[in-house]
C-alpha cells in the first residue's frame, strides 16, 4: 500500500493518541458513475446532487463516467478515502469540461477598495488578543519539496542557510520562541511527502512534532487519457495533487478531528522555505476577534514576483489567480504591476471548526491547475489545487497585506545568497530582519551557481549585500571572506577563466576580467548588463 494521508507523532505532544486514517478497500470494481464507492449515505447523496447538476448532456456524462472509471478503480485499490475519490472526480470533470482551465480575461477584474486589509491598520491591542488565543493555535509547515529547481536531491528544508542551521533548525528556534512568548505548547505539524519524510525525521530526532502526509492520485497519460502506467517504477504513477490537498488530508487522516478535540481552533500554514513567515500574534488576534474563517497573507507585487499568484475579482468574489490559469495571450496583463498589485505569499490562517463544517458537505470546489510533465519520455498531466484558492470557498474570508519581510522565499540559489548574506539580520529566536531600508536587492547568478552543490563550492563565505541594489555574477567565480557589493555591480568572467574574490569591495561598477585574470572596474552605466 502506498502513502495515504495520515498522521505520525514524533515526540510527546499527545501521548496515547493513535490517530491516523485506517484505509479500507472499496468493493467497487468496474464502478458505474452511481456513487457506489461512497459508503456514507449523506455524503453519497451530496455526491449524486453534484453529479446531476453538471452542465453536461446525458451522452457527455456517460462518456465522462467511462473516462473516470479507471481512476476510481485505481484510487479504490489504493485504499483512498471517499472524499479524495470525489475530489479527484471533481478535478477531472473540470478538466474534461474546460480542458485548459483558463479563466477568460473578460471575467477578471482588479480588486476593489476594502478587498485587502493593510497590516498597518491593525491596532497593537490585537497582540494581546493573539497571545490569549495562542492556546488554540497549531502551526503547519509545507515540507514536501525537494528543491529540484536548485539541483537538490533531498528536502529543501535541510539546506544550510545560516552557519550550521538549516531551514528546519531555524523553524525549530522560531517555535521555541513562540512557545516561550505565549506560555503554550503550540504544536508544530510538518506536511511531508514520501520524498522528504525519512530525511526530515532523522534530522529532527530530538524535536517533538506531528507529521502529516498528503494524498496521492494517479497521473494522467496525455495520449490515452487513462492513468499513467510506469513499469520501471510504480511510484512514478502517482503524485500529490498540490498544497490544496491539505484540507482533505487534515480530515481523512483524523488530524482535523484530533486538533479540534484538543481545543485547537486555528491553524497557521506557510512554506518551510519561507523563514519570514513567523507566527505573528497580531494576525492571530485579528482572526480571533473578527471570527474570520480564512485569512491569506499577501504582499505588494514587484518585478521579481510577476509570475506569482495574485488576487482578482471573479464572479463577484475575491479569488486567487495562478499563472497556470492564465491563457498565453493574457500573460502580459497578468504581469502588469499596475493592474494586479499584490501576490499570494502562500501563508494562510484557517479556522478549523469552520473548515470541518465545510468539509462535511463534500470537498472544497477549488480551481484546477493543469501541470504538464514528462516522465520517462511519456507526456503526462497532473491536476493540482492551490492552498490559497480556498479564499473563495469561505464566506467572510479576507486577505491582508503584510510587510515584505514576512515573505523570504528560497526558490533559487540567488534567493539563497540573499538569505545567507548580511542583508538579513538573523536573530537568536530564528526571526529575520532586513538590515537596510533600501529595498530588496536584485541578485542574478549565472549557470555556474545554479545548483546547490556548485553554489556551495563557489560561495565559501556569503558576500555583504546590505548596501546592494543590483548584483549580477557571470562565470566561474569563487567568493571568499570579506567580499562586499554595494549599489549596482556586474562582474563578468569569460569562459575558461576563474576568479577568486577575497577582502574586496565593489561599488557601482561593471567589472571586466582581462586575459591575465586582472580585474578592471568601469563606472556603472544603466542598462549595461
Regions found by a protein language model. Give the residues of each.
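N-terminal nucleotide-binding beta1-loop-alpha1 segment
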Residues: 130-153
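Metallocofactor- and cofactor-centric catalytic cores in central/energy metabolism, strongly enriched
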Residues: 156-169, 176, 180, 190, ...
Amino acid at each position: 500500500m502506498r502513502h495515504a494521508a495520515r498522521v505520525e507523532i514524533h515526540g510527546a505532544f499527545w501521548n496515547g493518541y493513535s490517530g491516523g486514517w485506517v484505509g479500507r478497500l472499496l468493493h467497487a470494481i468496474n464502478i458505474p458513475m452511481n456513487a457506489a464507492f461512497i459508503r456514507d449515505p449523506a455524503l453519497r447523496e451530496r455526491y449524486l446532487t453534484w453529479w446531476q447538476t453538471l452542465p453536461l448532456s446525458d451522452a457527455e456524462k456517460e462518456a465522462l463516467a467511462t473516462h473516470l472509471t479507471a481512476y476510481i478503480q485505481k484510487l479504490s485499490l489504493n485504499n483512498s478515502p471517499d472524499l479524495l475519490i470525489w475530489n479527484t472526480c471533481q478535478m477531472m470533470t473540470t478538466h474534461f469540461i474546460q480542458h485548459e482551465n483558463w479563466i477568460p480575461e473578460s471575467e477578471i477584474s482588479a480588486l476593489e477598495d476594502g478587498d485587502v486589509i493593510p497590516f498597518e491598520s491593525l491596532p497593537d491591542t490585537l497582540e494581546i488578543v493573539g497571545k490569549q488565543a495562542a492556546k488554540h493555535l497549531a502551526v503547519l509547515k509545507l515540507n514536501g519539496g525537494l528543491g529540484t529547481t536548485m539541483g537538490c536531491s533531498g528536502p529543501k528544508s535541510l539546506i544550510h542557510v545560516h552557519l550550521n542551521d538549516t531551514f528546519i533548525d531555524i523553524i525549530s528556534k522560531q517555535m521555541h520562541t513562540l512557545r516561550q512568548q505565549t506560555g503554550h505548547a503550540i504544536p508544530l505539524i510538518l506536511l511531508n511527502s514520501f520524498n522528504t519524510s525519512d530525511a526530515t525525521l532523522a534530522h529532527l530526532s530530538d524535536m517533538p512534532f506531528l507529521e502529516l502526509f498528503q494524498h496521492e492520485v494517479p497521473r494522467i497519460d496525455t495520449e490515452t487519457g487513462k492513468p499513467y502506467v510506469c513499469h520501471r517504477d510504480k511510484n512514478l504513477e502517482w503524485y500529490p495533487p498540490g498544497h490544496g490537498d491539505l484540507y482533505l488530508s487534515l480530515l481523512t487522516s483524523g488530524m482535523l478531528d484530533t486538533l479540534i478535540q484538543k481545543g485547537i481552533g486555528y491553524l497557521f500554514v506557510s512554506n518551510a522555505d519561507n523563514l519570514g513567515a513567523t507566527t505573528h500574534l497580531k494576525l492571530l488576534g485579528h482572526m480571533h476577534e473578527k471570527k474570520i474563517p480564512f485569512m491569506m497573507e499577501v504582499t505588494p507585487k514587484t518585478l521579481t514576483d510577476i509570475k506569482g499568484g495574485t488576487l482578482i475579482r471573479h464572479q463577484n468574489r475575491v479569488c486567487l489567480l495562478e499563472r497556470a490559469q492564465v491563457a498565453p495571450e493574457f500573460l502580459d496583463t497578468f504581469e502588469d504591476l499596475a493592474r494586479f498589485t499584490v501576490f499570494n505569499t502562500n501563508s494562510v490562517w484557517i479556522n478549523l471548526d469552520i473548515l470541518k463544517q465545510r468539509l462535511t458537505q463534500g470537498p472544497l470546489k477549488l480551481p484546477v491547475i493543469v501541470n504538464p510533465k514528462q516522465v520517462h519520455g511519456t507526456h503526462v498531466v497532473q491536476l493540482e489545487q492551490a492552498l490559497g484558492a480556498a479564499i473563495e470557498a469561505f464566506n467572510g474570508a479576507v486577505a491582508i497585506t503584510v510587510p515584505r519581510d514576512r515573505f523570504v522565499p528560497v526558490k533559487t540559489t540567488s534567493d539563497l545568497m540573499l538569505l545567507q548574506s548580511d542583508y538579513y539580520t538573523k536573530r537568536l529566536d530564528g526571526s529575520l530582519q532586513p538590515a537596510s531600508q533600501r529595498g530588496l536587492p536584485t541578485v542574478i547568478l549565472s549557470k555556474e551557481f545554479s545548483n546547490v552543490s556548485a553554489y556551495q563550492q563557489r560561495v565559501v563565505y556569503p558576500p555583504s549585500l546590505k548596501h546592494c541594489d543590483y548584483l549580477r555574477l557571470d562565470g566561474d567565480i569563487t567568493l571568499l571572506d570579506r567580499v562586499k557589493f554595494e549599489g549596482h555591480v556586474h562582474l563578468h568572467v569569460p569562459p575558461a577563466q576563474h576568479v577568486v574574490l577575497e577582502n574586496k569591495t565593489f561599488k557601482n561598477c561593471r567589472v571586466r576580467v582581462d586575459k591575465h585574470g586582472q580585474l578592471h572596474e568601469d563606472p556603472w552605466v544603466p542598462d549595461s548588463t
